[in-house]
Amino acid sequence: MTIFNRERLTNDVFKIDIKRMRRGWYSDKYFENIGVMLSTLAQQGYVFKGEALRFGDVDLSKTEVGNLEVEMQWFTRRSGKVVVAGVDKVLMMLKHCSGYFNGNGKFVNTWNRLEVEAVHDGATVTYSGDPTSIQPVIRVRGRYRDFALLETPTLGLLTR
């Protein structure tokens, strides 16, 4: 438990199936489709062409849809106090499997381009039942298509 010594466990402990995880073996097809769609839009240089009324006068016409950067948060919706586990393994999945395959079929790891914040395994978080008041256990900011494929396995780990 890393809450005691603040040291993260590594993949030497977990032995994640990196090769298959990078290929979407453990992911819902939906997330694979999203990754393909965003990669295709990026290759085509597609930019936002619609209207975004809630952004007012902000010009979004140069927004590259395929390269959108997002903040994704993992949090509990189980009421009361929850002991968090699985964070270190999720971080290893993100570290070894965030990225894409280039035109030559070589995996390009993009972990170093992500901004990641996470609590330590063993930490406690609470949820009051109010969906506007959550405590994220992990936050990742970066290009969504680089880690979309990991949504299913990371959620699965944290919800066991």
Task: Give residue ranges: language-model regions.
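Ordered alpha/beta subdomains of enzyme catalytic regions
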Residues: 1-160
